[in-house]
């Protein structure tokens, strides 16, 4: 057993990529700052011959063994070896599968690597995050047609945080500021694929949020127009006129949290997708 400031061997045995094991084990290991794991990752272990090598390495460097194996023969052999050399082993998905089986009253299909359909969702989120960061605040307008959602609105209507929240759900989201006197990107006038949502808040709410923002960055002096009531009211009116002109969906965000705004956008997107004819 390792002592503080030492290390221990951590064997991760998977019949697929091993990403599930790595994610779980690192989340737990992070709670033990004084002990460092030496990871031994064994992906695609699907035969007795492949397991031979794994068992030899485990015996050579004993430690904790975590596994995601669906082939019962491999599981039994691995567990027996760990018992023989007196080291702990645990199936990461086994207890969860047992819980599902007890509740659902049916057995699994035993499909190797099935959990890695989750990986597709993971990469979808990463792609969406990359897209959203590249298309924040009106940047790279030439790529707006590639978005799932385009958020527009005046300053401090939560466009960026809502974009990031949606991206974390795998929704490619761009956002474009609406500023009186500055033409909108011409691409915004003729979008076909994306849902364009115009975020609106009352002038009173915008002034409050903007004042707090200026105070937080020490820029209250010299930015009086930014929080001038008439100026802000004109901005809100301008945004509403544009929304009406181009038929953008209107979403009132005055009393909404980021999560609530994102949920409303996702509902608009789902409704739109249901209404579109299947091509």
Curated annotation (Swiss-Prot):
Key words, A-Z: Kinase, Nucleotide-binding, Serine/threonine-protein kinase, Transferase
GO molecular function ontology, one term from the record: ATP binding
Binding site for ADP: 153-160
Membrane spanning stretches: none
Enzyme class: transferase
EC number: 2.7.11.32, 2.7.4.27
Catalytic activity: N(tele)-phospho-L-histidyl/L-threonyl-[pyruvate, phosphate dikinase] + ADP = N(tele)-phospho-L-histidyl/O-phospho-L-threonyl-[pyruvate, phosphate dikinase] + AMP + H(+); N(tele)-phospho-L-histidyl/O-phospho-L-threonyl-[pyruvate, phosphate dikinase] + phosphate + H(+) = N(tele)-phospho-L-histidyl/L-threonyl-[pyruvate, phosphate dikinase] + diphosphate
A Pfam family per the record: Kinase-PPPase
Name of the featured protein: Putative pyruvate, phosphate dikinase regulatory protein
InterPro entries in UniProt: Kinase-pyrophosphorylase (IPR005177), PPDK_reg (IPR026565)
Function text: Bifunctional serine/threonine kinase and phosphorylase involved in the regulation of the pyruvate, phosphate dikinase (PPDK) by catalyzing its phosphorylation/dephosphorylation.
Family to which this protein belongs: Belongs to the pyruvate, phosphate/water dikinase regulatory protein family. PDRP subfamily.
């Amino acid at each position: 057993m390792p002592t503080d400031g030492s290390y221990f061997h951590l064997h991760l045995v998977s019949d697929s990529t091993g990403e599930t094991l790595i994610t779980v084990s690192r989340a737990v290991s992070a709670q033990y700052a004084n002990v460092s794991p030496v990871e031994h990752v064994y992906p695609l272990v699907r035969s007795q011959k492949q397991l031979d090598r794994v068992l030899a390495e485990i015996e050579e460097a004993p430690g904790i063994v975590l596994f995601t194996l669906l082939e019962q023969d491999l599981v039994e052999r691995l567990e027996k070896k760990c018992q023989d050399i007196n080291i702990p082993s645990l199936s990461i998905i086994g207890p969860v599968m047992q819980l599902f089986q007890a509740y659902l009253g049916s057995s699994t299909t035993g499909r190797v690597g099935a959990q890695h359909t989750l990986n597709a969702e993971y990469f979808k989120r990463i792609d969406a995050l990359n897209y959203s960061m590249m298309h924040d605040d009106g940047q790279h307008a030439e790529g707006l047609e590639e978005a799932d959602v385009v958020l527009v609105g005046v300053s401090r209507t939560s466009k960026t945080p809502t974009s990031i929240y949606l991206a974390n759900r795998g929704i490619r989201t761009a956002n474009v500021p609406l500023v009186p006197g500055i033409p909108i990107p011409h691409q915004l006038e003729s979008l076909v694929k994306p849902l364009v949502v115009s975020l609106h808040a009352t002038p009173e709410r915008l002034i409050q949020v903007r004042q707090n923002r200026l105070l937080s960055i020490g820029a209250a002096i010299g930015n009086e127009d930014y929080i001038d009531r008439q100026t802000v009211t004109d901005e809100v009116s301008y945004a509403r006129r544009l929304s009406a002109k181009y038929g953008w969906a209107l979403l009132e965000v005055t009393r909404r949290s980021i999560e609530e705004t994102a949920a409303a956008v996702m509902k608009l997107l789902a409704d739109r997708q249901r209404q579109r004819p299947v091509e």
